[in-house]
Amino acid sequence: MGARNSVLRGKKADELEKVRLRPNGKKRYRLKHVVWAANELDRFGLAESLLESKEGCQKILKVLEPLVPTGSENLKSLFNTVCVIWCLHAEEKVKDTEEAKKLAQRHLVAETGTAEKMPNISRPTAPPSGKGGNFPVQQAGGNYIHVPLSPRTLNAWVKLVEEKKFGAEVVPGFQALSEGCTPYDINQMLNCVGDHQAAMQIIREIINEEAADWDAQHPIPGPLPAGQLRDPRGSDIAGTTSTVDEQIQWMYRQPNPVPVGNIYRRWIQIGLQKCVRMYNPTNILDVKQGPKESFQSYVDRFYKSLRAEQTDPAVKNWMTQTLLIQNANPDCKLVLKGLGMNPTLEEMLTACQGVGGPSQKARLMAEALKEALTPAPIPFAAAQQRRAIRCWNCGKEGHSAKQCRAPRRQGCWKCGKSGHIMANCPERQAGFLDGPTGKAAPQLPRGPSSSGADTNSTPNRSSSGPVGEIYAAREKAERAEGETIQGGDGGLTAPRAGRDAPQRGDRGLATPQFSLWKRPVVTAFIEDQPVEVLLDTGADDSIVAGIELGDNYTPKIVGGIGGFINTKEYKNVEIKVLNKRVRATIMTGDTPINIFGRNILATLGMSLNLPVAKLDPIKVTLKPGKDGPRLKQWPLTKEKIEALKEICEKMEREGQLEEAPPTNPYNTPTFAIKKKDKNKWRMLIDFRELNRVTQDFTEIQLGIPHPAGLAKKKRITVLDVGDAYFSIPLHEDFRQYTAFTLPSVNNAEPEKRYVYKVLPQGWKGSPAIFQFMMRQILEPFRKANPDVILIQYMDDILIASDRTGLEHDKVVLQLKELLNGLGFSTPDEKFQKDPPFQWMGYELWPTKWKLQKIQLPQKEIWTVNDIQKLVGVLNWAAQIYPGIKTKHLCKLIRGKMTLTEEVQWTELAEAELEENKIILSQEQEGSYYQEEEELEATVIKSQDNQWAYKIHQGERVLKVGKYAKIKNTHTNGVRLLAQVVQKIGKEALVIWGRVPKFHLPVERDTWEQWWDNYWQVTWVPEWDFVSTPPLVRLTFNLVGDPIPGTETFYTDGSCNRQSKEGKAGYVTDRGRDRVRVLEQTSNQQAELEAFAMALADSGPKVNIIVDSQYVMGIVAGQPTESENRIVNQIIEDMIKKEAVYVAWVPAHKGIGGNQEVDHLVSQGIRQVLFLEKIEPAQEEHEKYHSNIKELTHKFGIPQLVARQIVNTCAQCQQKGEAIHGQVNAEIGVWQMDCTHLEGKIIIVAVHVASGFIEAEVIPQESGRQTALFLLKLASRWPITHLHTDNGPNFTSQEVKMVAWWIGIEQSFGVPYNPQSQGVVEAMNHHLKNQISRIREQANTIETIVLMAVHCMNFKRRGGIGDMTPAERLINMITTEQEIQFLQRKNSNFKKFQVYYREGRDQLWKGPGELLWKGDGAVIVKVGADIKVVPRRKAKIIRDYGGRQELDSSSHLEGAREDGEVA
């Protein structure tokens, strides 16, 4: 334990173990408590060595005692432990911790002579006089003295942190409590926070960063005069290298005070603000009012998040005035906008007080359902026959029964019978009309009707009188609506059920389906009482109003749309709806709308389903021989699991997913990410493995449509196909491969698995299948409307026509109905009828098109990824903004750079970006295509080989573009012009289906001169030549034939690859020569230098002969510019020549001047080091027939030469070069077999792991001879396992006896099955091949077998480690011995345990198992993890067994786990 062993020695250690943790307790102190205390001191900046003496312990106690009243349990335990150690050093005998505490405190008070310096909890925060204020630094007698912080202040700070959990209130609380504090006091406050070590670490990092910045901004001045106070460093301000007196002097010295306290406070505030943001991650921009959330709750959340924002008050004021209203829900936003500009918070709260409450929700629901419950339109004549209200008591019009002054009639107002009143009427149905009852029933008289019929008729009889005509008219109008209820058993339709549905016959179906374009309101009969009800899949229960079901009910309070409702719950009630009779539970109460919830809908067999397209799914299979993905689901956070569960349940309800059966073995990982608005989650599935094994698909649509290719039309409409992929069914046989799993937190429940029923997002087949389906769906529409332009790319559809507004809308409606009828949705929020139309990144108008707003990013620091995005935006803008350039921007990110690497801007790139910004500031517009006009393309050459072009019809520009791609380092304008024309031609064919007429800046003669030699450029469309300056010209004159009478130069260059030294020179036919020495060059550069020398030393006309294809290719291309310095010099020299003839000859072929110059420049440069090794390698191969790798390794010749030696050997070309690779096995495993050659028996043994063989000829295939060979083999090599076939010689008693004696495990295979002993079978074959190669070198078969074994063991290299079999076997045996030695050595480590610290965490962890102890580090196994820990952070302790494990301070006796204080 290092220094900690010296804390207590001998007798003191024995005395420690006698002291009890608590009075009369059983547990006593142990050495581990001292170890723990020494570790804890590091947290307070105190040295461990202080524990070794009485005085050191006193210093520790002086530091800790002010913190004890407000400190954590760890701090109190540390204080108590130090008190006990102090008593042991003072030779004071104590029995327990409490006695040691009292004794230590009394001694300290007596030694100082006053109790002033011992902090007391009852001490006031401020002096009684009040003059000094609540400042730790106060003035007394003209001097500044330091008053430690009171426990009350520290306690307030600790409670603030614990209660607010680093909420927004912590920062102002710290500012108030630390006013006037020194760094010493602030450190005391930070040390009081026992928990929240993550936050403390963040604050420490901020302190270190700020201290480093302070040191950088305030360098150390020169030497100071004696006695002068030094300037504070960053560590001084942090209080780690300065005393309290120094801090006070810096704060109050004259002149030039340094407020170290305030500076340190500011650093801490920065750290606290970072902690607040970490503990309160909600951004103020993300605080939005929910659709059902009250405004007051939203305001509370808004201001809580606003307090956490560390920004200027003016910005907070702006946030309050704008964001508070902007992020409110639509209902509150409507109210708030009516309050005018800058309303007060009180006005906003008052105005929105009722918004979102139960009463408003009930009112909104009633208004929304008013239309659904309003009777259908009735004929005008019937509508005129409205009757005045009539009293049920006296039969007169003009008043109701409640207002009637006449004596009350006897009998029931409901059925007309006497003996009971209406409230107790046993009849379920009023008998005087076939119409609604309850609150909606018309108030009709009980007396006779005007037609003389009895109003108290049964429901089966037709109504008469005016009221009967009204209901008859309404029923007729309902039938005229044509609404249908679709049957699930055949798609049949039936008229919507009316109020007399039971009397119309059984027209209902077993499983009704409702289209939800309108609210599904039907008539139900509850105990034969008709009621209009809404089928509500979102409601759990069913509630109706206006009916009586008797007294057999249970009172119940339920939460409804109008708040809490008192209801009566009836069970087992008979309900007839849609011609089906069921019994269910129903409630009656005062509800704004009658609803049937899921309890009844489930009984009826109904569910809410999303219609999937009625299309035959396309059969999809996996690639041949492939199986579906079987990847495990990785762990997810609880938040993501809940989001995925919600998404999957919704998709399952909508019919897009179904639960996977337990027999499905496939799985693909799933995860979730936040959408752009950061409020909703998006489910993603990693289909990479499924995409890899799925069959390939053809990309049907290779690009996106361009607006310049659209014909000009009067009317345009844009619509979107919602949930496009989720509307196309996936083939049923393929669904099993899309299975995925939703994990559960802590494995609390079995994981739920799903498969896709529709096309999944992220699967490679979805785009192709969707596009194919959409083409099939839209093809009939296109044929039926040939005058309509229909552009479809994925889920975006554009319809354009010259029809009238009504006809255009009609055709759009037809398309929507076509898509809706097949199960596709066309969301209204993405339906665009009026310009401008947002389409595919463009902005469309009837007569023009533009790009959507382009905003270039503004950044201080640019990374490679930022530049890539910037160039992408500029390239997108270049299709309509002429003059956009990106050449110098692209140069910024040349080479191998990571995406996050910072980019250094050049002046040219900055100028290019500024020029592009100016271009983008001027808005540009494009025109639409008119087929009758000619299509033209004009090409313009700008500076730096950047080309611009525009495609136009007359003066109307359809689109523009740029070209700056240079495929070669050295190029010329004509070649680039051909590439530009090629690009424009392909682009025009794709967009318009025709090639434009070109206007090019080149003369016909120039083009044809270049074209004659360079006709290989892939494809160039025909054009008319129109010369527009600046013209492209060829800069120098290359002739095709040698120039007679002119000096001829033979050039060559050479370079040494190791030293990078080279020579360049030439020889002429007139005897001249010149050689130049080069440094740090290459062969190509040397060849170019030689060519440049020939040009410089020649006349106006010259013939030059080169042997470099590289130089010939550059010069023949007639470049006009290059990035190479030498090539630019060559271009300048060739421009000055009248004529140049350049030819190429092959090198090293003995051609005249070329051979001479080759010798001239090769002296001392070119070295062929391996030539003398080729002949010995050939001799080696002729003797042993070594393989390529052995020759390369032994003789150091190139692999190409070694391969040539082997290929020229007739014996080695029978089967070609063997495929290397060994099957790894245990070191003691051998295989043995017998083979026959030339009538002799050869026994062969092979070491499986290395391929090493032993073989010899035996006289007979017997057990005795085999046993002798095995004994000989075991005496040479370690063998633990022998595998043979089950031949009689291997299964004999002799072999078994030898195997038993040596300790060999024997196993058998099948004699004629090569797989059972494949290694030795293959080696038999190789041995015979080797024997055939060297058979002529020996007479007897015995000799040649041993020679062949030597060749195979020592002359063939390859396989594992690129070694020979002999080298490999010896290496394996050596490695095995080393491993055994290390294992024996490391077995002693198991007796020790290791406690360790990680990173900056000061807490000790462990114990771990010691695996290895090195000089600088130890290797520790903790659970399943293996860690490497530096020796200085590890403590190795012998494991005595049976002791309590110590992994952190919380396991100390007397710590918080026992709830007791040491």
UniProtKB/Swiss-Prot annotation:
Residues 1392-1439 bind DNA. A motif (Tryptophan repeat motif) lies at residues 1007-1023. This is Gag-Pol polyprotein. It comes from Human immunodeficiency virus type 2 subtype A (isolate D194) (HIV-2). The gene is gag-pol. Mg(2+) 3 binds at residues 1233, 1285, 1321. Residues 512-516, 560-566, 599-611 are annotated as: Dimerization of protease. Residues 191-228 are annotated as: Interaction with human PPIA/CYPA and NUP153. Its cofactor is Mg(2+). InterPro entries: Aspartic_peptidase_AS (IPR001969), DNA/RNA_pol_sf (IPR043502), Gag_p24_C (IPR045345), Integrase-like_N (IPR017856), Integrase_C_dom_sf_retrovir (IPR036862), Integrase_C_retrovir (IPR001037), Integrase_cat-core (IPR001584), Integrase_Zn-bd_dom_N (IPR003308). Residues 472-482, 497-507 have a biased composition (Basic and acidic residues).
